[in-house]
Design a protein with these regions (language model features):
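Bacterial N-terminal signal peptides that target proteins for export
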Residues: 1-11
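Bacterial N-terminal signal peptides
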Residues: 9-19
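Residues embedded in well-ordered secondary-structure elements
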Residues: 16, 80-82, 92-94, 107, ...
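Extracytoplasmic
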Residues: 28-201
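Low-complexity, glycine/serine/threonine/alanine-rich intrinsically disordered linker
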Residues: 28-39, 189-245, 257-875
Length: 875
């Protein structure tokens, strides 16, 4: 007999009721979430299109790093192409607004470069440009005047027409062409604002949100007992207490209140039609509605009397936050130490949310993308503390995960000292002159006064709080001792800073809300929570000023600061820290597809094998970043009509994989490369559900794992993590070929595997989610059949009332019922923001957040701003 499912989300109170009676066949027209575009990009009078990132790379064109030739090239790179005389490179660039422009071309010159013609839309605009030069360098700027351009992609052609008599040939027959950048200068020299979609409207007016079909009046106590006896007691009553849940004890309001978490479990299972199981007698819809109304009323009454939540445990900074905080406190030019947490590495800035526009192409490297890791901008001789573990179903910023042992405390003392004593510190630190250096002719007394003046604002920033006189005296006294001993102002200030970096007031985030009951955060605490939420770092001076005068406690000022901080490049921390953990992308690092079964996944560089997951991992993060920068709907994470991929990753999704038949050595690129925006028409692609990264990291070495994939979807997309599996699980074949040799599909074999009732209950929820992705093999490539020829069954049902035939229809159900994902995403983000697990007491706040987010169709900034204005965030 199936048991009561034991996994649930204590917060899914308001919207799961609308799941119960949805007629999936009568779906509303789907809302176009791509129309949501919030932050308006400023269209400046001059726009620079970088050759290596903003032009489509076609044919033999590629990005080339030019740092070995000097610092002349914009972005340290250019677009490189080669061909024989008569061949052309056809590419394009983006025009933001129609108008008349002057185009300024910056080309590269070199010994093996040819003579070019330039055409726009097939019309010659410049002829016989000789790019030969005895030395590698930049050509004189070339201006093409008074060109009328339409908005959108503009075609441009470079035709190789000949060569200088002194030019050398490239690879015996070809000549090269290099494009550093193209500048578009508007003739009227005006500032424009790009048009964006109107996102006004309300939840009630939107066709995108399903309405609850039935509402019921609450049952009386006797009616509730009779209903449960009729439909539930056979498995959960009296002696039959499967899942350790005896519903015969829940016949009174008092029991429902005192066992509120079990009450919530009951409610969720009934609302999602998980209970009663499909093979049991089902209550009529009207009865189910009245049961829910009864339990909802009890939960609502409980929440009225239990507004307070568990306090946030005082926690230390995790490794990523500590590096960011030191970087911003000391104004370092890069990171303090290597950070594997920063998946994407770049050598040019591309994340500019204030612009409202994400680049069409980005040159990036993965944190472990082979032999060319970008780690130059760190301090040598500085060793970080151990990586912080991610909490189960959560993030690595929770207090119960971030304690300080005596060994770790000692490492902080050593770490602070190693930072200021690093050989590169003076050149790496932007405040060396303004903070660590005194005038050469300053007397001892003047140095004492100067140090005290500099320490006051420094300590306020480091400790995120007002600096008491006693604290200032203590650090100034330590400076005086060091100055007497060393007679060096710079070294004495470094000694003080080393102490600050090891101070509990720097290392710990401490809030008054640690006391019992709800305690509103003071202005400094609120500034700290906000900055570590959005930036994973310290407040800046603007935010500190709002905390200092108390204005940050005003809702309009807090909202203004939130919007300002979202437009700061430091908000990229949300992608680097939140998105990476939310998507569980670290699991891809340890994914090991069988090298014999999937040789195309590996490339040997030297003595080491590198996995293609290095490229896969970048794709969902760039999608997330583009959503942030352009303030789009988070529903694009479910289904998007664009993505960012390298050429090799783009081929990975196709039927033919060019490098599949190459030998293992240097099979694919493991170094820095370009990820370009790709428009998608195949809805089997797009979003994070069907990203190769997701599909690969949730597979076994020899086959797919519908259980792991289903658990990932339940956890990440619905915030409904399944419980840990039983200690003893009957083995199942690790190789799908062994299963298929028995004439069975993986779905049929897993059904045999469910030998007891508890297995059935859990698998009934997660298996359909996993099998929806079964058309993708263990490395994320599409297949229509199993290798044996057996048909793949990707059908399923979501929450007992939303059938789907394949993964596209699963996406359609999620788009038709966006509150499912919007609630889960908001819960994940809120939990990350307040650094603790959510509780039932947070449900009213989540409902308020969801209402605002739904009204704005999931716009990213609305998620963030609603969380910051919520009760849990401010208390």
């Amino acid at each position: 007999m199936p048991t009561f499912p034991i996994f649930f989300n204590v917060l899914s109170v308001a919207f799961t009721a609308s799941l119960v009676f949805i007629d999936s066949a009568a779906a509303q027209p789907r809302f176009d979430y791509h129309s949501i575009r919030g932050r308006q990009p400023l269209l400046m009078a001059t726009k620079r299109c970088e050759g290596e990132t903003d032009f489509e790379l076609r044919g033999k064109s590629r990005a080339q790093d030019m740092r070995n030739f000097g610092a002349l090239w914009s972005g340290d790179a250019h677009l490189l192409w080669d061909g024989v005389v008569g061949e052309s490179l056809q590419t394009s660039f983006e025009v933001d607004a129609a108008g008349v422009y002057d185009l300024v071309l910056q080309l590269t010159i070199a010994p093996d470069y040819g003579i070019l013609d330039v055409m726009l839309d097939g019309t010659d605009v410049c002829q016989s440009i000789d790019t030969y030069n005895a030395q590698v360098g930049l050509a004189p700027l070339l201006t093409i005047s008074d060109v009328s351009l339409a908005v959108g992609r503009q075609a441009i052609t470079f035709k190789l027409t000949g060569s200088n008599v002194q030019a050398q040939k490239f690879q015996a027959s070809n000549y090269l062409m290099g494009l550093d950048y193209l500048e578009l200068k508007r003739k009227d020299n005006s500032l424009l604002v790009a048009p964006v979609a109107d996102i006004s409207g309300s939840l009630a007016d939107s066709d995108a949100f399903p309405q609850q079909a039935l509402k019921g009046a609450p049952l009386s106590t006797d009616e509730l007992t009779a209903t449960m006896k009729q439909f539930c007691f056979r498995c959960h009553g009296g002696e039959a207490t499967e899942a350790k849940l005896d519903l015969s004890l829940f016949g009174t309001r008092e029991t429902l209140l005192t066992r509120i978490e079990d009450t919530q479990r009951i409610r969720d299972a009934v609302a999602r039609r998980e209970m009663p199981p499909k093979d049991e007698r089902q209550p009529p819809d009207a009865v189910r509605a009245r049961m829910l109304a009864t339990v909802d009323a009890v939960i609502s009454d409980y929440l009225k009397d239990h507004r307070s939540h568990s306090p946030v445990v005082m926690r230390r900074l995790n490794r990523y936050e500590y590096s960011n905080a030191v970087r911003d406190l000391l104004q370092l030019r890069g990171d303090v130490y290597p950070l594997p947490e920063k998946t994407i590495r770049v050598d040019n800035l591309y994340f500019d949310p204030a612009s409202g526009r994400f680049p069409n192409a980005v040159r990036v490297s993965n944190r472990t993308m082979g032999k060319e890791q970008i780690e130059e901008k760190i301090l040598t001789s500085v060793s970080p503390f151990a990586i912080d573990l991610q909490a189960d179903g959560g993030f690595n910023n929770r207090g119960n995960q971030l304690s300080v042992s005596p060994i770790l405390l000692e490492s902080f003392l050593t770490l602070g000292r190693s930072i200021v004593d690093s050989p590169e510190f003076d050149a790496y630190c932007k405040i060396t002159d303004s903070f660590f250096t005194s005038p050469q002719d300053a007397t001892l007394e003047q140095q004492q006064i100067l140090a005290r003046m500099r320490l006051l604002p420094f300590l306020e920033l480091a400790f995120r709080s007002p600096v008491e006189e006693a604290v200032l005296n203590r650090y100034h006294g330590y400076f005086s001792q060091c100055l007497t001993k060393t007679n060096s102002f710079s070294q004495s200030m470094k000694d003080v800073v080393a102490g600050v970096l090891a101070s509990p007031r720097f290392i710990y985030i401490s809030e008054s809300a640690f006391e019992d009951g709800d305690v509103p955060l003071n202005a400094y605490e609120l500034a700290t929570r906000l900055s570590f939420f959005l930036w994973s770092s310290l407040p800046d001076e603007i935010l500190l000023a709002a905390a200092r005068d108390g204005s940050l406690l005003k809702p309009d000022v807090l909202d203004l600061q939130t919007r300002r901080m979202l437009e700061d490049p430091r908000s990229q921390a949300l992608a680097q820290n939140f998105a990476r953990q939310w998507l569980r992308l670290d699991q891809l690092v340890t994914a090991v597809p069988d090298i014999e079964r999937f040789p195309q996944y590996y490339s040997r560089i030297g003595c080491e094998q590198w996995g293609f997951g290095l490229q896969m991992m970048v794709e969902p993060l760039l999608l997330f970043e583009s959503m942030m920068v352009e303030d789009r709907s988070v529903m694009l994470l479910i289904d998007s009509n664009y993505t960012y991929r390298s050429d090799e990753l783009q081929a990975w999704y196709g039927a033919d994989l060019p490098f599949a038949d190459r030998e293992n050595r240097n099979r694919f690129n493991t170094e820095r490369q370009q990820f370009s925006k790709r428009l998608l028409t195949d809805r089997r692609q797009g979003g994070v559900l069907t990203a190769a990264a997701t599909l690969t990291m949730t597979s076994s070495p020899l086959r797919t794992s519908p259980i792991a994939r289903g658990a990932w979807v339940a956890t990440v997309i619905f915030n409904q993590p399944p419980p840990p599996p039983p200690d003893v699980i009957p083995p199942i074949e690790a190789d799908d070929k062994v299963i298929e040799a028995q004439g069975l599909t993986l779905r049929e074999r897993l059904k045999q595997h469910q030998v007891n009732a508890s297995c059935v209950a859990c698998h009934a929820k997660i298996d359909p989610l996993g099998f929806a992705l079964e058309n993708f093999d263990a490395i994320g490539r599409w297949r229509d059949h199993y290798s044996s020829g057996l048909e793949i069954d990707a059908t399923g049902e979501l929450f007992g009332s939303m059938p789907f035939q394949n993964v596209v229809e699963l996406k359609d159900q999620l788009l038709a019922h966006p509150e499912l994902f919007l609630r889960a995403f908001s819960e994940h983000m809120l939990s990350y923001a307040i650094a603790r697990k959510l509780e039932l007491e947070d449900a009213p706040a989540v409902d308020e957040i969801l209402s605002k987010v739904s009204t704005d169709h999931g716009q990213f900034s609305t998620v963030i701003r609603s969380i910051v204005q919520s009760h849990p965030f401010q208390n």
